[in-house]
Amino acid sequence: MKKFLSFKPAEDFLRSLKKSSQWFLLIIIVEVTITLSFEGYVFHHFRLITVEKIDVFINAMVPSTFALFCMACPYLLYTAVDALLNKDVIQMSALLIFHVSLFCLSVVQYFQIFSKDPRAIFLSALYLIDPIRLVTSFNYHERIVVNSHMLLFYLKPFVIALPVLIGVTCILLSFLVYKMNKAFGWIMYQQHGPDLRMRRRYLVYKIFMSLIKSDYYFCLTATVQYAIFFSTISRVGLALTILVFPCTIATLMTCRYAVYRENRALLGIVQFMFMCGLAYFIYNCARLYLGVDYGDIAVANICMLVFSIVTIIYLFTTIVVGFYCISNFGYGLREYLRYIHQKQKVNAAPAVPKVRMPLDD
């Protein structure tokens, strides 16, 4: 029980970090905590706004952005810890690019939430409400709309603070990554050796692995957004969207195995699945943009459209780098990866304590 409750591995990990790495992890933890708090506060108060058909607008908009940021926070924390554990500057740089995309999405979220006045939404939805119920409960609905307008006013500082927080965090992390790149330079040289060609192949491999980790977040989060969105449109679309989950996870796991084992046939199948996924996201992106069968909800969900475009860019980049990885097969990268993995195990192993042998009299 004491071993189970022991925090010694975490303590050893924190002690092994330098000051710049500790600040890097601390900033990520603070950012994740504040982001979850702000998004949870906004989401909770938005759920209070329910006015007949107006709640369709709210239900289609707010949960999708809430799911986006809620899934981003564990991804940020995991990627930061993994990058510091492996002293992977490439993954840290990928984390900075991820922050830029998250900053753009937080700005889009602000314009999405405050683009329409609740009164205008209410008046545009009058024809959808039963006339008898409208006459008998108009004052009730009007009072809720006024309260909703005041609620949006009180929530505005929290929604504005989110892109400011992400932007400042990105600037601070950029400075720390620059310092850590200098500190880890000699360590990386000791691990990889002076062979420039092999180092370039290894660099492409690490970039591809970072893209795969990003694809986990973007593809699965986009699928969650589509599932929330399609739940208000059709059950068939919801069922098909849920089926994308296991296919995405299986494809990305197979991709990691195929690259590490240098299996051309398996990675070729994975590349084909990536192209199918790219076509799937382009199709949904086009439907969101054109507003087919969605009506006003498509106009409201700009954030989902922007997120789909970012997912398409990441997936397309993964496909391009994947073909580059296939061209590097057969040049000793597989053995090189095994050598680095064994070397990291040896370096991570605890030192054998020196035991004094007593002298015989």
Swiss-Prot record:
Q: Which GO terms describe its cellular component?
A: Golgi apparatus; Golgi membrane; plasma membrane
Compartments, as annotated in UniProt: Golgi apparatus membrane
Highest taxon in the source lineage: Eukaryota
For this protein, the parts annotated as crossing the membrane are 23-43, 56-76, 94-114, 120-140, 158-178, 207-229, 233-255, 265-285, 302-322
Recorded topology in the membrane: Multi-pass membrane protein
Keywords, A to Z? Golgi apparatus, Membrane, Transmembrane, Transmembrane helix
Q: What is its main location?
A: Golgi
Query: Which InterPro entries does the UniProt record give?
Result: UPF0658_Golgi
What family classification does the UniProt entry report for this protein?
Belongs to the UPF0658 family.
Report the protein name in the record: UPF0658 Golgi apparatus membrane protein C1952.10c
Lineage of the native species?
A: Eukaryota, Fungi, Dikarya, Ascomycota, Taphrinomycotina
